[in-house]
Amino acid sequence: MLCRKNFFTLSCIFILLVAMMSFIKPDKKKKIIFFGDSITQMGMKPGGYITQMDSLIKKEGIDNYQLEGAGIGGNKVYDLYLRMDTDVLSKNPDIVFIYVGINDIWHKVTHGTGTDPDKYEVFYKAIIKKLTDRNIKVVLCTPTVIGERNDYSNQQDGELNMYSNIIRNIAQKQSIPVCDLRNVFIKYLQENNPTNQEKGILTTDRVHLNDKGNLIVAQQMWKLIKDVR
């Protein structure tokens, strides 16, 4: 009789636990969207910075982030603004990395287009506002390099520094985290490019990242993700 009572009690406890488990929802993964140009578009491919970041996260035994790329080759800051409703806001992200600026500078030389600094700042701030109005956390990224010479002799170094300062100033005034890839790349090239090569250290063609360049971006962004609350 005692055994039957114990069995009945254990059965009830088991049923209760199963019922409780059915009401417990798994933790929702934080959705992070990386919003940018061809560097971000390639970031989703093998060896890309988003793919490498996903591997870094999994190596730490973490499984509560969902990484998505929203990069399109050739995009400038106004392209991002025009497509952000469809490519970003509709997906309800928790965090968005804004990583744009290379084409705004580079295309002035290669295509005769580009984006003037004042217009760049206006569109950049407009993107931020649309995100923060939706309570989406934002991380800003400075552009990396157009040419890897470490003595500031690359043609667009001056403009890269100018546009990076625009981003840094916005970040400071609005208390937004900034992933300062420009500074990180400059420091790395000063220490690891003794022959002052134009490409091949962190990029394949002066602009688009090789595996090492992608890894550095992944590492820097992952550090910031862990601090975003």
Regions found by a protein language model. Name each.
Residues 2-5, 25-27, 52, 59, ...:
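Alpha-helical cap/lid subdomain in secreted, periplasmic
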Residues 30-45, 73-76, 105:
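Catalytic nucleophile-elbow at a beta strand-turn-alpha helix junction centered on a G-D-S/GDSL motif
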Residues 34-35, 69, 140, 203:
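A structural signal for the hydrophobic beta-strands that form the central parallel beta-sheet
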Residues 41, 68-71, 140, 208:
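Short catalytic-loop micro-motif centered on adjacent basic/acidic residues
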